[in-house]
Structures are given as structure tokens and as C-alpha cells.
Amino acid sequence: SDDAVIKGTQAYWRFDRHEAGSPLSQLDVIKDLSGNCNDLILKTHFPSDKNTLRWSDAHHPSQPGHGSLNFTAQKKPLKGMYLQTRNGAKINSNTFENGYTFEAFYYLPSSWDSEQNAWSSLFSRRGSAGDAGIHGEEADKDEPIVTLSISNDRELQWRVYPLESQNGTTNWGHETPFDQWWHAAVVNNGSMTKMYVDGSEVARNPAQKAHGLTTLNKPWMLGGFEYGGKLDQIFYGSIGDVRIVDRAISPEEFMFRPDLDSSTGK
């Protein structure tokens, strides 16, 4: 059994055991190691060089899996590759009413460029606020209903539209330093949401209530971001292990375990 598959794990993806530097192909399927069949399939925004998404053996020192995906996409003109769950995957309809924990390891290289790479997602849910019937004063009808984004200042942004709400909620992380691996976690206990970076709670967590996540039963994307219902941006950088759990977990349960040096394999 995999230690990273804890109680309530809905999806767990890792990217090790591949030839580093080789591109992904349309035949590659990222298996969901939780056993829930929420596998990821490759999507390409044409025209794209097939080398815009590659396997890598780079990883955060405390990451369970010893590998990652290296994305080299751009916005103008939009090109690149991303992954998504299949239509009908169980996790597409999950509303996380009892809480959630989303975790991802990520890395931004110093070649990251705000003009080309800002407002991309580590992961996001397809479907816009407007399509979900959300029209509050602070709602942006074109925004995706769930996204963990990288802003123009390289800040993490968890921007979501909770259930029974006509407006979204936002958690902000700090500016991400280049050329270093980070662990991001967003934890909701059914009513409040907190973001953590490398196990520490960020300063800008909102006080407003947030219950569950709106869904239009569409796929989740890894590395893709929609705006106005169309693909708008693709990630630039690297993404390591990603885990989604349908409950709030404590920082001690995070995949980020600084007490473990993964090079020992323990």
C-alpha cells in the first residue's frame, strides 16, 4: 500500500518511474493511485511542440514520489500541454461538503515570465461561475469555479466558488521564490479555508465562511486554466505529487514531511 493514500483520498497522482527528459505522449495515462479511477489523460492545445510537457526526476526533497512533470507552455500565442480527468470521472462531481485538502508540490524556474506565464493554474475545475448560475456583486462570471493559480506576482491564489454562495472566496500565498520546490496545501473543514506553504499557514487567509465546492460535473485540469469557458492559459514550471482528500487534514498528515529525507527512501 502507498503511505500517501490516507483516509478519504479521492485522487493521488505522482509522476515518477519514467525516463527523465522524455516527452509525454497521447498514450500516457497518469493512474490515480487512490484506487478511485480518477486517472489523468493528456490534452494538447494545437499547435504545440510535443516537447512542451516532459517527465522529470526533479522533486521536492520531502515529496513521496521521486519525479515531476515539467511544463513549458506560453500564453501569446497560447500553446502547451496539460492533463485532465476523463469525462465522467467520479471526482468531477465531488462537492466536498464535509471539507477537503488539496496538496501539490510545485517549482517555478527563473525563466518564468509574467507576460507569458501569469494566471496559470496548478489545478482547476472546468466550468465558469456564470455557467454555475453565480452572479454575486464580487463574482466574475468568466472565472473558473475552482482554481489554484499563480498570479502575475507569482503568488499562490486559491479562488473558489463555494456551495450556496453567490460570490467567491480567495486565499493568497506569498510571492513564490524561483528555482526552489514548494509544497502548497489548501484545507477546508466544512466552513473555513486555510492555505499552507511548506507546512506553515499563510498570512492572508479569509475569515469568511466557505462550504464545499461548486461543480458542473466537468473534468479537473492539471496545468490548464479556463476563462470564459475556454482554455486561457497553461502552466509553466514543474508539478510534483498532487493529492486530493475529502476532509480537512492536519499539517502533520501533509505529504510535506520535513522530518523525512526522501533520499533514504523512508
Label each residue range with its predicted role.
Residues 180-194:
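Localized edge beta-strand/strand-to-loop motifs within extracellular or lumenal beta-rich domains
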Residues 1-80, 133-142, 210-211, 254-266:
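Extracytoplasmic low-complexity segments
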Residues 120-159:
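Glycan-recognition/cleft segments
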Residues 1-4, 42, 70-100, 168-175:
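Short surface loop/edge beta-strand patches of beta-sandwich-type extracellular domains
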Residues 205-238:
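Flexible glycan-contacting loops in extracellular carbohydrate-active proteins
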